[in-house]
Amino acid sequence: MLRAIAAAKKKNDRIDANKICDCLRCDFLPVCYMASTAIRERRRTLRYRNLLVRQMVQMKTKICTLLMAAGVSYDKERLHKAGYFRELLANNPDINDGLRSLLKLCRETLVRLSKTESALVRSLERDPLLMERVKRLMSIPAVGPITALTWALEVGEVQRFSSIKKAISYCGLCGDQKSSGNTVQRTPLSKQRNKHLQTTLIEAAKMAPRYNPTLAQLYNRERQKGNVNRATLAVARKLVAYLMAVDRGQTHFLVLDNEERAAA
């Protein structure tokens, strides 16, 4: 109906309002979930933290760009460490006064952003509304504070998902399909998703096989099929299943041995 309104030949506010009212009267409009005010405020803080992280990356990239533009050689693995950076500015003859002032400004901005980001994360971890929930989620191997906070604040009430498949779809970890006649197009990931959750879960899935043997087996099994990205997505989907189970049951994550699984 809404697509018909958008493509109508005669279109004005009165006609559109009448059509929308008819849809509402017939219960054709889907219900939109709205998180509580407390969750929205804390989610705003977490998303602001993500902005600070992007700015930190920009500052690090700018420092590297300035050094390369001036032909200064440096150790990229130690560049952003405080001691090495001070030594580089003090002893390298290729760095003139103008470049040195810009590099110091970038470094000061980077340190300030890092301190602010750490303070925001600590404040969310110590929040009484989130503390117990985050601790339970962090009991899952490979789930750290950022992944736990992102899940808790972006999902809100986990009971609104009736199945794991719906949660996976909300996180954007499934493909999209567009078909017309005999033509079927599939995309690796759907664009209709929560992009904050999608990014965090994919990044967590890249590190998860190092900390969780079960996820490592899943990753290796999927990787043998020839696609590394599909293996990462499979791990991310399994993480969603773990997060939903812990969040719904309100219990810590338990790892069962093979003997206990057989007995169960």
Predicted regions span which residues?
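Phosphate- and other anionic-substrate recognition elements at nucleic-acid/protein interfaces
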Residues: M1-P93, G175, S190-K191, P209
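Low-complexity, acidic/Ser/Thr- and charged residue-rich accessory regions of DNA metabolism proteins
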Residues: N182-R186, Q217-A264
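Conserved phosphate/pyrophosphate-binding and hydrolysis machinery centered on Walker-type P-loop NTPases
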Residues: K10, A38, D75-R78, L103-R107, ...
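Glycine-rich, often acidic, oxyanion-interacting loops/wings at catalytic, nucleic-acid
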Residues: L46-R136, H196, N212, N258
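Phosphate-backbone recognition surface of nucleic-acid-processing proteins
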Residues: A8, R136-S139, P145, L149-Q224, ...
